[in-house]
Amino acid sequence: MRAQASVVLDHHLAECGGAVAGTVRWHGNGRRQRVGVVLRYRTEGRGDVDTDVVAAVELGDADAGESRFRLDVPPLGPVTYNGRLLRLLWVVAVQIPANRSFLGTAATADLTVVPNGWLR
């Protein structure tokens, strides 16, 4: 059986240089693989597709659990952009096993990243 997970963000909006926090729940990790949370962005549209993991935290290898997390958003972003030719999207993903690839993604939550100072 494949492990199942869910992620709930405290807020779906974060500033460059700020942080995103939330709660992860998982169960069915009978193979005791590492559970992790990553913050990553990806581009879509014309041209090359790009993706990068900018922050990650491991939560352990329990069969089931619930854990709080906090991931730092880079000070220089990039910010979320939704244009006609290009989109830049952010996501928080639960990964079982915990690694920096897209393999093993068990749950995701979308995030909007805005320039520093916009939320004041």
Give residue spans per PLM region.
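C-terminal beta-sandwich interaction modules and adjacent acidic
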Residues: 1-120
